[in-house]
Amino acid sequence: MKIKTSDIVMSAVAPKQYPEEGLPEIALAGRSNVGKSSLINTILNRKKLARVSSSPGKTRTLNFYLINKEFHLVDLPGYGYARVSKGEKSSWGKMLETYLSNRPNLYEVVLLIDIRHEPSEQDQQMYQWIRHYGYGTIVVATKSDKIARSQHQKHFKMIRDTLGMSPEDRLIPISSLKKLGIEQLWGALEDIFVENELPITIEKEAPK
């Protein structure tokens, strides 16, 4: 996917704050500190568009990024951060449920899992939630450069088995640091654009 323009256009906590253009949306979900901001910057070829923090739990809103003026990439609040009150966790859960259940122009939710660790109970719940609302599913295994390639298949099996992934679910290893797996992820998203006949221009990035 050739990225010509990308900008953050909205941060929202309620439906009345969502963008109203009705453009197609692709959402990214995952635990705090799983690497969502780094992935956004990498796939959009921007260094600091999404703020990367070493402190988990920084994303507390739904952040909408307008891509090529044709669709939105939506960064969902990270879950699983221990130093958050029960009330705040509950409000985040309601925010996510409201968005996932009442957004007709949302076409896919991509779940990010740290390849190094077994998916947590909250990861499993999020996966089931995504399936419940009828999305793909695409699972991205982040930080794939942090383990030896010889260990990848072992960790892929761990992720698939723990989440209970279907054989048709896509599991894509990604390294934002080394820019590995980016084309594969865009390919999976482009398939969704085509399958749903979305008016999104699919133009490949020229080889470097």
From Swiss-Prot:
GO cellular component terms, semicolon-separated: cytosol
Gene3D superfamilies (UniProt xref): P-loop containing nucleotide triphosphate hydrolases
Assigned keywords, A-Z: Cell cycle, Cell division, GTP-binding, Magnesium, Metal-binding, Nucleotide-binding, Septation
Residues binding Mg(2+), per UniProt: 37, 59
Manganese found in the keyword field: no
CC cofactor: Mg(2+)
Disulfide bridges in this chain: none
GO molecular function annotation: GTP binding; metal ion binding
Annotated GTP binding sites: 30-37, 57-61, 75-78, 142-145, 174-176
UniProt record similarity statement: Belongs to the TRAFAC class TrmE-Era-EngA-EngB-Septin-like GTPase superfamily. EngB GTPase family.
Its job: Necessary for normal cell division and for the maintenance of normal septation.
Domain EngB-type G: 22-195
Protein name per Swiss-Prot or TrEMBL: Probable GTP-binding protein EngB
Organism: Alkaliphilus metalliredigens (strain QYMF)
InterPro entries per UniProt: G_ENGB_dom, GTP-bd, GTP-bd_ribosome_bio_YsxC, P-loop_NTPase, Small_GTP-bd
Lineage: Bacteria, Bacillati, Bacillota, Clostridia, Peptostreptococcales
Keyword set includes Cell division: yes
Swiss-Prot/TrEMBL GO biological process terms: division septum assembly
